[in-house]
Amino acid sequence: MENPMVSQAEQLEQFRDYLHLLARLQLRSSVQVRADASDIVQQTLVQAIRGLEGFRGKSEAEMAGWLRQILARQLANLVRDQACQKRDISREQSLEAALDESASRVTAFLAGGDSSPSQKAVRNEEVLRLTHALAGLPEAQREAIVLHHLEHRSLAEVSLELDRSTAAVAGLIKRGLRELRVRLQAST
């Protein structure tokens, strides 16, 4: 007989790359926070596993939203701890809103609108496939794509951030997008 907690924990694991991308986007935009996104995602998943019995959602979208809330709390705790301040609920809420915006940017990267529950389910599956495919790219390509397409930075800004020429960044993005297409087609 299958242990339902194991299958739920495995289900949580499929969101690791998605959460990692969201955490990286938030950490990059927060000047005052210097931390590793992988550590924060690990803490988020540990908290989620501990709270699985209390999760009442039924869809992947509800699971993703619940995990974003846990991630927002982890980031708020990190900001609080690093700033040695008392807990600021407005900051936690603004982090949660920023995470929702980051999630929207990832979803918007996949063109199209959601008009039915089945379309939303397909979209959520595509977002997970995209984040898994992004995670498998070489780091330089992944960084260039995230900065340019998800953070909407110009090629010049990305080239400064990555300390590469604009032509080199354009090449990274072109090769990365080509590889993303291959990976996404292979995963269907």
Features from the language model and the residues they span:
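Short, charged helix-capping/linker segments at alpha-helix termini
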Residues: 2-14, 21-43, 58, 165-166, ...
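DNA-recognition helix of helix-turn-helix
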Residues: 130-131, 139-141, 147-150, 155-186
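Amphipathic alpha-helical segment used for protein-protein interaction
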Residues: 19, 100, 104-146, 153, ...
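Short alpha-helix-to-loop micro-motif enriched in aromatics/charged/Gly
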Residues: 52-61
